[in-house]
């Protein structure tokens, strides 16, 4: 079967469903595909298709995630749904499913529960920019006042985590009734998707951001100079442009004298390309894996940061024993391991803990032995002797 060409005629946005267990995330996801399928904008999927999510490995961590895609009038969406709560935590921290926005599903019958709060907090910490609320199971609540109270409670909760509670749309839906073909509730799903279209901003394309390429390999070509290879993470780079080499040692400036891909010469490389960049006046020993090549002045190296971390359980290949403040692992950042220290930590809700157990989620302060190009929202892994024992996201740069 020939692979269909991916039509790029609409802007692409990544979203997901988040919220408390059994509040109807997967049923709602199925309902969205079914309602849009009637307009030819999706392939209808049932609960079982989505719930039997295959396992994936991301940064050495096994995660169950279901991916569905669909379109609205103006956009193409990739939508992720996770079966278990632990999968959400791992997914959002590793960035396996990068979300440009999320649909927070909350049952009108229960109101916000423990994981509702935890997912809002997680969305804030990992930098999900916008939310839309689907107030689910509204067919089971007859009293309009109860629905109003739940809505108020959700808005207050969103405010308390610094989301704009008053402005976020809350749409009353019933995933189940819409799946069963009830036209009243089908129109509510359409209303929800209109809210998603309007409230979740279109992400800035990687190509439009300032140039950055993490160095994976370096070699010298006799008579031509030094070549650094890697995948361009964002932006573009033209032949003749000045770039900075950042990280590990002092920042220095060089000029790109050639861009090569698949042994062909290019005028410019752009986000997503695997390229070799020929650099003027740079010796092979001046540049190493783990450094980044960037647009001048766009990034500075740092040694201290705060991060949100998920520590792997023993069964996931993590540690068997706890660790304490002062623990010295390697931080795998972009393309290299950098030795560092976890100088302090609290549990994810900010309460003090003496030690970190496998399976915990923590806020930590990390300090690296040499400066590297780290940025807020960037993902990293924590490793010990080459195996991943934790995954994290930088929540704040300290120094």
Curated annotation (Swiss-Prot):
Localisation: Cytoplasm
SUPFAM superfamilies, sorted: EF-Tu/eEF-1alpha/eIF2-gamma C-terminal domain, P-loop containing nucleoside triphosphate hydrolases, Translation proteins
Key word Transport present: no
Region annotation (G1) ranges: 19-26
Region (G2): 60-64
An example Gene Ontology molecular-function term: GTPase activity
Superkingdom of origin organism: Bacteria
Gene3D superfamilies xrefs: P-loop containing nucleotide triphosphate hydrolases (3.40.50.300), Translation factors (2.40.30.10)
Binding, GTP: 19-26, 81-85, 136-139
Domain tr-type G: 10-204
Catalysed reactions, as listed in the record: GTP + H2O = GDP + phosphate + H(+)
A Pfam family per the record: GTP_EFTU_D3
EC number: 3.6.5.3
Chain positions covered by the region annotation G3: 81-84
Chief place of localization: cytoplasm
InterPro entries per record: EF-Tu_GTP-bd (IPR041709), EF-Tu_GTPase (IPR050055), EFTu-like_2 (IPR004161), EFTU_2 (IPR033720), G_TR_CS (IPR031157), P-loop_NTPase (IPR027417), Small_GTP-bd (IPR005225), T_Tr_GTP-bd_dom (IPR000795)
This protein's GO CC annotations: cytosol
HAMAP family, per database record: EF_Tu_B
PANTHER family: ELONGATION FACTOR TU, MITOCHONDRIAL (PTHR43721:SF22), ELONGATION FACTOR TU-RELATED (PTHR43721)
Name this polypeptide is given: Elongation factor Tu
Name of the gene: tuf
């Amino acid at each position: 079967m020939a692979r269909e060409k991916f039509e790029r005629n609409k802007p692409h946005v990544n979203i997901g469903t988040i919220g408390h267990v059994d509040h109807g995330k997967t049923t709602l996801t199925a309902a969205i595909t079914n309602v849009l399928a009637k307009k030819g904008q999706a392939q209808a999927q049932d609960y079982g298709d989505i719930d039997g999510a295959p396992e994936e490995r991301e940064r050495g961590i096994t995660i169950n995630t279901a991916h569905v895609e669909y379109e609205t009038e103006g956009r193409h969406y990739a939508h992720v749904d996770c079966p278990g709560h632990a999968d959400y935590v791992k997914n959002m921290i590793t960035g396996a499913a990068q979300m440009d926005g999320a649909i927070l599903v909350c049952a009108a019958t229960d109101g916000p529960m423990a994981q509702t709060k935890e997912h809002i907090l997680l969305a804030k910490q990992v930098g999900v920019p916008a939310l839309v609320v689907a107030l689910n199971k509204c067919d089971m609540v007859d009293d309009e006042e109860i629905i109003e109270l739940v809505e108020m409670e959700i808005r207050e909760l969103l405010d308390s985590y610094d989301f704009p509670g008053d402005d976020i749309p809350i749409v009353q839906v019933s995933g189940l009734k819409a799946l069963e073909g009830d036209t009243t509730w089908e129109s509510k799903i359409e209303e929800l998707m209109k809210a998603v279209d309007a409230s979740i901003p279109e992400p800035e394309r990687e190509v439009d951001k300032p140039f950055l390429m993490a160095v994976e390999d370096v070699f010298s070509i006799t008579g031509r100079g030094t070549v650094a290879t890697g995948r361009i993470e964002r932006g573009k780079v033209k032949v003749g442009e000045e770039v900075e080499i950042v990280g590990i040692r002092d920042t220095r400036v060089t000029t790109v004298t050639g861009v090569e891909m698949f042994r062909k010469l290019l005028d410019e490389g752009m986000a997503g390309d695997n390229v070799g960049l020929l650099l003027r006046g740079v010796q092979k020993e001046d540049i190493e894996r783990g450094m980044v090549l960037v647009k001048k002045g766009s990034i500075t190296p740092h040694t201290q940061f705060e991060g949100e971390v998920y520590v792997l359980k023993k069964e996931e290949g993590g540690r068997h024993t706890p660790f304490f403040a002062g623990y010295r692992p390697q931080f795998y950042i972009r393309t290299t391991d950098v030795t560092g220290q976890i100088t302090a930590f609290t549990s994810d809700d900010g309460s003090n803990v003496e030690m970190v157990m496998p399976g915990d989620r923590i806020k930590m302060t990390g300090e690296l032995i040499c400066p590297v190009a780290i940025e807020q929202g960037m993902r990293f892994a924590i490793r010990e002797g080459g195996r991943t024992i934790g995954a994290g996201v930088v929540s704040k740069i300290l120094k």
